[in-house]
Amino acid sequence: MLGRRSVSLLRGLTELPVSSRAHTALRALSVPQTRRNVATKPNYEGHIPLNWFENALLTAGAAYMSITDPRRGDMVAALGETTAGPTVSWLRDQMLASPEGRQILKDRPRITSSTVDMDKLAQMPEGTFGRAYINWLERCGVTPDTREPVHYIDDPELAYVMQRYRECHDFYHCICNMPVNVESELAVKYFEFANLGLPMAGLAALFGPLRLNAQKRNWLFTEAVPWALKCGSSARSLITVYWEKRWEEQVEDMKKEFGIWDGPEARWSKPLNEAKEAAERRSKTTQNQIY
C-alpha cells in the first residue's frame, strides 16, 4: 500500500499542471538526485525523465484524472505517453517502411496555426483536403494549437512519433467526417486503436462510454464501433500519411487510396469557442485582400 506521503503526492498529482507536477511532486518521492542515473538528463527540449516509480505514479494519477475529468488534456496526454510502451516503436517502424513515412521522420513537420497557412487553405476549392480541414475546424470550433507537447518518452525520435500522432488526430476526424462531441471522439478512438494500436486509444474506448447516456451509448456500440473497427483495421496506417503534402488533393480520392469510408451519421454540436477568434481573423484578412 502507498504510504501517507505517497497518497499526498498522488492527490497533488491530480491538481497541478503536468510540467509543474513533474518538477516538484514527482521529484519529491524519487530517489535522491545524487543516486539517479545520468540517463535522466533531458534528451530533448521539454523532456522530463522519469524513473520507474515516477512513471507508475504518473500513470495511475493520469488514468484517474482522465476518467473523472476528460477535459484535463494534460493528463490524457501524459497517460498516452506513459502507456505507449513498444507501440510507438512499432509505429516508427511502419513509418520507416513507407517512403511517405520516412520523409515525415526526416522533415519532422509540426501542425500548428503558425506552420500551416490557414488563409491559403480557406481559399482552396471545395472538395480539396485543405478546404475540408478548414471547414471541419470552423464547424467544430477547434484549432490545431491545443495539443500538449510530449514530455515523458525518452527517445527523441519516438517522442516525435507520438507528437505526430497527437497533431494528426484532427485529420482523422476530418477525413472520417466525425465531430468532436464525446460519442464521436470515442468512435475515433476505436478507429485509432484498430488502425494504430495505441493503448491510450483502447483505454479511452473502454472507459469513455461510461460517461454516455443510453441513447448515445446505443449509437456508439450499434453503429459507430462496428464501422470504426472494420474501417480502422483495414485502412492504411494513417501515421504514415504526409497530410501537409496533400492539401490540394480531393478528399474522396484520398479516402479511396487509404481504404477509408465515412462513419455513421453523427450529431454535430454547437462549435466550441477556441476557434471562433481564428475564424474571425481569417474573415477579416480575406475582406482586406478583396478591398
Curated annotation (Swiss-Prot):
What pathway does this protein act in?
Cofactor biosynthesis; ubiquinone biosynthesis
Enzyme class comes to lyase
**Keyword Transport included in the entry's annotation:** no
Q: Which cofactor does it need?
A: Zn(2+)
Catalytic activity annotated for this protein?
Answer: a 4-hydroxy-3-methoxy-5-(all-trans-polyprenyl)benzoate + H(+) = a 2-methoxy-6-(all-trans-polyprenyl)phenol + CO2
GO annotation terms (biological process): ubiquinone biosynthetic process
Q: Where in the cell is it found?
A: Mitochondrion inner membrane
The residues the record assigns to binding Zn(2+) are H169, D170, H173, E185
Recorded topology in the membrane? Peripheral membrane protein
| Keyword annotations of the record | Lyase, Membrane, Metal-binding, Mitochondrion, Mitochondrion inner membrane, Transit peptide, Ubiquinone biosynthesis, Zinc
Give the span(s) annotated as Disordered. 271-291
Keyword Mitochondrion tagged: yes
Q: What is this protein called?
A: Ubiquinone biosynthesis protein COQ4, mitochondrial
The organism encoding this protein is Coprinopsis cinerea (strain Okayama-7 / 130 / ATCC MYA-4618 / FGSC 9003) (Inky cap fungus)
Q: Which gene is the coding source of this polypeptide chain?
A: COQ4
